[in-house]
Structures are given as structure tokens and as C-alpha cells.
């Protein structure tokens, strides 16, 4: 009787048009239900039956219904799926050839039915790691989710799984590129000055093989120091547009992961033909500049193509020990002693000048994983930045400033690192926060390089980093740009790196531009697309380093879970759900859930905005506080470390 009834169809249409519909992001929970977050302001409850049609992270439109005075979201249309390509673990039941894959994500617990493509012939076992692509979604008319396995990664118990899974997840290479037939040294009509008689030295870690910078210094009659920075020249072997150049462009950077690296260039180039090894004649690009007695750079900046020969491979710790008068190491000759002594003087001059005229980053330790041949973590050692590290840092910053100036003045373009300081849209919040802390600041001034530097120096004088940490939330991210621009974070009006061409494609580009200036030839400006590719690769490499690190930290700290072992930790972030802390001894990041801070939720307030935890109206914790914690739990499946404060 109601079939094809026009009145009923009209009523349905009216109800449909009157129903509120919103677009938002699905947020899953571990309990089966979820929420639809709309513009970060409003969230709607998604009951378990409706959650079976969507996945955490899906962007959807949903109809909003009211049930017992509660607004409920019913997802209707998929706008953008959370999962496209993903990695996960194969699930397989005994005596059943069907396969499922569980995505490797903390909030995706359900196994997805899957099958391999015809090209994937590996006989999958339960627990194997694989990469897959989503093919079916319930909101796209399918009965359920379904994925297609596009590749095998490794078996379940492979101790190198953290590396192989992470590299596959981010679509990054696992191996060094191979040498190509067209990779031959070809300078064309470029003339090289022979500087092999000068006592250039390299200073690196003991295990470094890809040495790309060497230093030489001489004292002048007027008291200035003539600093020469020699940088390895892979562009002598790699022509622009060649096969190897395209590979380097794609990789963009050497990928440094805990335990090993995946180079941008073939190892025979990066660790042999181009590496500035001791007593080996190598092509190099040299920057020469005077360091005046007050630390200022002279106006005699010069770049030229050269042959150099490093006279010694020095090691950071040994040079630092000698300068700090500890240990037993001695330089091999008086000439090397002179070089080290003068380089220390150069470093002191430049550091003092930067303190007064630019900005200096606070020293933060590096953490190095010591692994055995099977990928087990034997130890994690803290490597502090020492005197020799600062020598190399000052020399590299000096040479990058010189390159930035020459590229700007001679060409007007190059690959520049640009950082614009505070986000203009948030500058009023910065001013308000500073005024609350008795710092008088003006909006217009804070958006200038000088005003930013003045504020940073004032914050550096504070007894704690609490205000500094809160202010950093309002800063922009550093960008890679094809034109000059200021770098507020360093305190310079322009900054362009060129000192690591073996490891960074951006530095290879700047090498070619500097060579064009030396040879007085025309050259094209780098494209915005190239800069975007460099930035994206840098982001992926950093995520890969973090992911592998998280996995290894979880392995390393698992034996301490549930024990009374104490760790000193710094509070690095405060969210509504609790604290994130960094363990001082090894650099691991752990999470302290809010209930571990105080049992009565109504008496507890965790505020990211103020950077504080308030218990019963009193500030109990704040950013950068140092506290003692113990490891409560290590969740290996999500690589999460859960800690709690010691009583």
C-alpha cells in the first residue's frame, strides 16, 4: 500500500533535508565507540554499531540524531579515508588459508580481511609484517573493509623489524644507491687551485666515514684569523640531470637512523671518492674568510674550487680532551697542535660575537644507541656537545653565512633556510603572555628580527625555561625557500647551507650555484617544487628516526617495567590527558596519565595553554620541571612507555 507512495517519499525527503549533517574527523577509542570531532570545537558520540562502518582518522559527513537527549553521529559519506597504504601484521588461523591484517596503529585494533596481489608470492605466516592498500570501505558501498597486500616486509621475530617496518611505512629506501655508469669525475673547464700543502684537518666522530668538511686556519699580522673551510665536492662526479643526480634529488638526504644510515649517494662516493680522508687528494669547494678580533666576519669572503689533502682525521672527544687538559691523547705534530689551538680561538671569537649579535641554541645532548649485530640494544649513551663540537659548529655556521651572502648578492637566489619567528596571527597571545610575566613587548617589534632576538636573549637570562617553552608554541616552522629570507631562530638575516653535499641535496644545489658564480656562468633558480620535495623528505626522515627510536626505547626499557628503578625526567609537554616526560639518562619519551598524578579527577587540571598541572588549586607540576619517575608499563604493540611519578 505504501510502495511508490509519493506522499511517503516526500516525507522521507523532508526528514532527510531537516536532519543536521556535519563534516568531521572520526576519533576511535579502545572501547568500541568513537567520536566525530568537528572543527576541533564540537564532538558527537558514535556508538559501536556505527563505528563498524568507519575507522579512526576517517574524514566523513554524518547525520546527527538525538537519542535520550544525547546527540549521536551516524556516518553517511566518506570524504577521505584514514588508511590508504599502510603496514601491519598478518593474522592467520590454523588450518585456514584466509588472511587478515591488523594495521600497526595504536587505535586500529580490528583485523581487516585481505589477500595478496598476484605479484606477491610470499607464503605468509601468522605475525609476518606486510604492506597493504585499502580496496573496500563500508561507506563506499562495500559490505565491509577489505585490503590488498602489496608487499612482504619481514617475519614476525626479525630483530631488524623496527628498521624495515618503519622504512616501508614511510616509503623510504632500505639500501644505498648503486654507482651508475655516468658517474665519472668531470670538471669541464673548471680550474682548481692546489691547496694540498695546507694543513687541513677533519674533526668528526670516531666512526664517521663520510667526512665532508675539513678546516685550516692561519693567524694574520693584524690579529685576524684566516679561516678556510673545505667542503667535499660530489658535483665533480655528478652532473646536473644525470641518473645519480635524479636519485639524489629523490632521496634528498642521507637517512640517519639509530644503528646505521642509508646514504643519499653511493657509498663509494660518500665514504671514499668524495670523503676527505687523511692523506688523500680530493676535489673540494673552499670558503675563505677573515675572523676579526671581535669575532666579526671580514669583508674578504671568497669561494674557489680546489684540491685539498686532509693531514689528520681528528675525533671530537680526543680533541676536546686535549683542549680541556684531560685524557692522554696528543696531536701527532706541532702543525696539528697549532691548527687545533687556532681553531679554538676562532670558535671562542665567533661564539662571543653570536651571543651579542645573533642567537645561540642551548646545548642539548645527543643519545646514541649501542646495538649488537642482531639489532639488540646493548646500551644508550649520552653524548654531550663539547669543545671540539663547538669548533666545527662555529666553522660551519660561518661558512653558511658566507654562502648566504654571496648567493644573495651575486644571484639573488639559492636554497635558503628561512624561519620567520612568531606566527603573526598569534602575536597578540604572545604579547599577552609576556605581559603576564612582566615583560614589556610590542607587537610590531616582536615580528622583526631585532625584536625577536632581543626577546630570546631576555628569555635566556631567566632562571628556568618555563616561559621560553610556552612561548615556542607560537613560533612558525623553519622552511626551505628558493629566495633569501631571515632565519629568526639563528638570529641572521639570511642563512644557506652548503657544507654537507654528500648528505643533503640542497647543499649540492648550492654547490652548483657557487660554482656558477666562480666560473661566471648562467644558472637557473631552484624551483619551489624542489624546495617542497626537500621539506617533505626531511619530514619523513625525521618521522622514521623517531619511530625506530620509539621501538628501540620500548625494547630497552621493557625489563624496567613494574620495577622500582628510578629515572630522572624533564616534563616536555602537558596535555589534558597527562604529562610527556623525557628521561635524562637515555632520551626516551614516556607518558604519565593524569590519574597517576592525582586520583580525584575533579581536583586535577592539566592545561597545555598554561603549561601547568594544578591539584587542589595549587601548581603541582609545570613545563621543564625535573621529576623522578619509574616505568609502570611498556606496551610493545604500540611502542608506548607509561611512567608514574615516584612517591
Swiss-Prot record:
SUPFAM superfamilies: Nucleic acid-binding proteins. Residues 192-519 form the RNB domain. It comes from the Bacteria. It catalyses: Exonucleolytic cleavage in the 3'- to 5'-direction to yield nucleoside 5'-phosphates. InterPro entries: CSD, NA-bd_OB-fold, RNase_B_OB_dom, RNase_II, RNase_II/R, RNase_II/R_CS, RNase_II/RNase_R, RNR_Ribonuclease. GO terms for biological process: mRNA catabolic process. It is found in: Cytoplasm. GO terms for cellular component: cytosol. Residues 564-646 form the S1 motif domain. GO terms for molecular function: exoribonuclease II activity; RNA binding. Its EC number is 3.1.13.1. Keywords: Cytoplasm, Exonuclease, Hydrolase, Nuclease, RNA-binding. It holds the Pfam family OB_RNB. Involved in mRNA degradation. Hydrolyzes single-stranded polyribonucleotides processively in the 3' to 5' direction. PANTHER family: EXORIBONUCLEASE 2, RIBONUCLEASE. Belongs to the RNR ribonuclease family. RNase II subfamily. This is Exoribonuclease 2. The gene is rnb.
